[in-house]
């Protein structure tokens, strides 16, 4: 284990929830690919990774189970979904509008909806960073990709 290698090398979503729509599955695949390519992930009190992250929903709570690359347990963090519910609901509503707009709207309408979608996504990402504070240090881009995955899990669940 390389000391100070604070990054994710693998991210897995709980498969027991099942699959979702092709649009949502595409978002999941892109978020995982981008997350593995570039991220900052520093569990508090640990010397360094890289890390494997398993994200799941258990009893309506968000669970981040962290292991080292060689599968040694690092920590598990359980977060309430309550601070995310409104943001996720708003995000899903605007995503539905966005996917509809892609099929039938003008570029300026699509851009306006996309700006709103990104704004709500940023709010969710900041909320996730705040909830992880003191547990896992992440940069904003990492939080954005993780928030996408939280939404995918929530959508399936």
Swiss-Prot record:
Q: Which HAMAP family match?
A: UPF0262
The UniProt family comment states: Belongs to the UPF0262 family.
Protein name, per record: UPF0262 protein Atu0536
Task: Give the species this sequence originates from.
Answer: Agrobacterium fabrum (strain C58 / ATCC 33970)
